[in-house]
């Protein structure tokens, strides 16, 4: 009896510890651009829908440009972090641009501060993230990072729909199929070497379908879609479940208004709830892109989208995380 009580006590401590480290609305900071239409409206709408405390919502002044200079960005970031409550552990950035700080993504620059070593000069690797495949979620307290996700606000209708999807997915267990697509592009197909491991490790939790060619029919059950091409020709055939994630390994996906390659925001317009793309040349290092296995390992253990996506990228300096950060389809975090 005594042993059983002790075991129960240990279990409760583990559960309590897990809940203490999970991301909640109370720990999410919401930043919007005072100088851009829709930014404030979307931020306030999001805070209301997610019941985020008003003290967590902060307006800042940002130039409405694609890329902000590191010199202009540094004081803006510092002033914002100084004004947010000390309980904040993650950020949502409610604007569409700037999406880059120099050659870093704006989400990574807010997370770690602008650091030149995060920018690849030529085809080089960049520093590892201390959050990669990590346990718990107290990044500010443990490593001094403020992981961020961009919630694009230029199209207010899309922003509201994105918020709806994220909330609608909560605690649904997200039934559906994870699609892993091989392509004929040898560089952009770099993640395919790990697809077999994804299927092996996740098949007991969801349907995982590895394809040697893009889908050639309409699919209505996508909870994830990972590929490697400059333009996703099959995009109109893809219909995503609320809470789904999708991205394509290519150089310029994070350039949200780009035309030479498909911008990552196209995934959101098609129905995904979160996506990812790089804002400067990554040279197809797989470490600079999301690892589907790591992402869904954390996602299916009850972590939020922002936690799961951030933990899936080893070298995130050039990568832009985009979507609704608090979506949690698989319920509360399990220890």
Residue ranges and their predicted role:
Residues 6-17:
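Bacterial N-terminal signal peptides
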Residues 21-335:
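Cysteine-dependent hydrolase recognition
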